[in-house]
A protein has these predicted regions:
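The feature captures the beta-strand-to-loop junction immediately N-terminal to the Walker
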Residues: 36-38
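Helix-to-loop junction immediately C-terminal to a conserved catalytic motif
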Residues: 51
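ABC ATPase NBD coupling module
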Residues: 55, 67-87, 110-117, 129-132, ...
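ABC ATPase C-loop
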Residues: 151-152
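Catalytic Walker B motif of ABC-type/P-loop ATPase nucleotide-binding domains
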Residues: 159-163
Length: 235
C-alpha cells in the first residue's frame, strides 16, 4: 500500500539549530496517526516539513508516492495535504467569509470558492452564522474553527492538525474532534499532533512518540496508551 503521506529519514534545521534527526513516519489511506511528545520535542517542525512550510535539510517527503521534498506549500495543498497550524491562524481584521475566500481562491482559483465555502459552513455552522463578522472579534474556539476551515478547500487526502486543543475549553475541543472524526469517515487521513493527548489517542490507529527530534516509539494506539499517559499526562 502506498502511503498517503510519508517522511523518510528527515532532518530539519533552523539556522545552526537541528530540530529533527532522521524522522521517519508514514500515514496510510484512511489512517489516523497521533504524534505526541513534550513541548519542544519537534512536533510542529514535523508538521511544517510534512506540509511544505519548511524544507528538510535531508531526507524525503512523499504524497501518494510522489516526491514532494522541498516543494512549496501550495503544491502540497493541491496534492491534498491540509495543514491546520498551531494557534489561531486568521486575518484578524477581515470578515470570516473574506478569510475563507482568500484561502480557497489561492489554491483553486475563483471557481473553487463557492463549493469550498458551502463545505466550510456545513462543517462549522457557527461560521456560516458569523460570515460577516470580523475574525478578530470571534471567540478563541471560533477562531480555531476558522483556521481549520481555511485549509478545508475540499475533502483533503490528509489533514495535519497541529495542537488543535491548545488553549480551548473542553466543550470546544470536543466539537473540533467530532469534525475530525467526520472527516475520517469521509476518507481523510489524519496526522494529529498534540501535547494533551487524550483526544488524539481515542481517535488514532497508531501513535508515534517524538523525543528531542527523534521518533522514540511507534506502535498501535492500544499498546501506546499506558506508556504515553505515563510520559506526558500530569499525575
Amino acid at each position: 500500500m502506498t502511503a498517503v503521506l510519508e517522511l523518510r529519514d528527515v532532518c530539519a534545521e533552523y539556522g545552526p539549530f537541528r530540530a529533527l534527526f532522521g524522522v521517519s513516519l508514514r500515514i496510510d489511506p484512511g489512517e489516523a496517526v497521533a504524534l505526541v511528545g513534550s513541548n519542544g520535542a519537534g512536533k510542529t517542525t514535523v508538521a511544517r516539513v510534512a506540509s511544505g512550510l519548511l524544507a528538510p535539510s535531508s531526507g524525503s517527503v512523499t504524497v501518494d508516492g510522489e516526491d514532494m521534498t522541498g516543494a512549496r506549500i501550495y503544491k502540497f495543498a493541491r496534492a491534498g495535504v491540509a495543514h491546520a497550524v498551531e494557534g489561531r491562524s486568521v486575518f484578524a481584521t477581515l470578515a470570516v467569509e473574506e478569510n475563507l475566500t482568500l484561502s480557497f481562491r489561492r489554491v483553486h482559483g475563483r471557481a473553487g470558492v463557492k463549493p469550498s465555502l458551502e463545505r466550510a459552513y456545513e462543517l462549522f455552522p457557527v461560521l456560516g452564522r458569523r460570515r460577516g463578522q470580523i475574525a478578530g472579534t470571534l471567540s478563541g474556539g471560533e477562531q480555531r474553527m476558522l483556521s481549520l476551515a481555511r485549509v478545508m478547500v475540499e475533502v483533503p487526502k490528509v489533514l495535519i492538525a497541529d495542537e488543535l486543543s491548545l488553549g480551548l475549553a473542553p466543550v470546544i475541543v470536543d466539537e473540533l474532534y467530532e469534525t475530525l472524526t467526520r472527516l475520517r469517515t469521509e476518507g481523510t487521513s489524519l496526522l494529529i499532533i498534540e501535547q494533551q493527548v487524550s483526544h488524539a489517542l481515542a481517535l488514532a490507529d497508531r501513535v508515534a512518540i517524538l523525543d528531542h527530534g527523534n521518533v522514540s516509539w511507534l506502535g498501535d494506539s492500544s499498546e501506546a496508551k499506558a506508556v504515553v499517559h505515563q510520559a506526558f499526562e500530569p499525575a
